[in-house]
Amino acid sequence: MSRKLALPVFLLAAVLCAVWSFIEAKQPTPASLREQLIDALDSADAVSYQPDRLDSNHAEGIVTDAKYVEEICALLRRIEPAEGVEWPAGEEQYLFSKASFVLLSGHGSEELTTADGTAETPRCYILNDRGNDRTLLFVHNGSRSYENKDFRLIGALPFTGLDYTIAMDQKLQSRTGSE
């Protein structure tokens, strides 16, 4: 009798282990999200630029200048892990509407402005957290929804995001002015 039970019990245990492994694999960890960010940095070919309206003269939009995209990606590689980093207190507006930069990849130039082209994931959103003199990095989950619950905080950069926005805006101004 015990031999007859051994096979079904073994099979049940194997199925449960497989299901548990699948569930664990689906839960993003800070390490897997950082890996997604690195993949996004490696494949980024454009940046959706939304300058700080008070401190920028440049129109928002898509920037495909390779050197500019490269500079942003190089800086973002300095990300610090998100341990101990929290969503900004009192955040009421959607992160999507407050992001200064969005890394884009896999787009044709005419597709860059589509509002729902989220299939090219992951997308990295960069938010200036001025109250804490830092820049927060988020990865969007790829859904068609852009509520705050659809973003995962993956890390921070330890400098004032506003300063960086202004500096990159000035670089972009000088590039477009020299062309």
Predicted regions and their residues:
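Function-determining sites in protein domains
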Residues: S2-E179
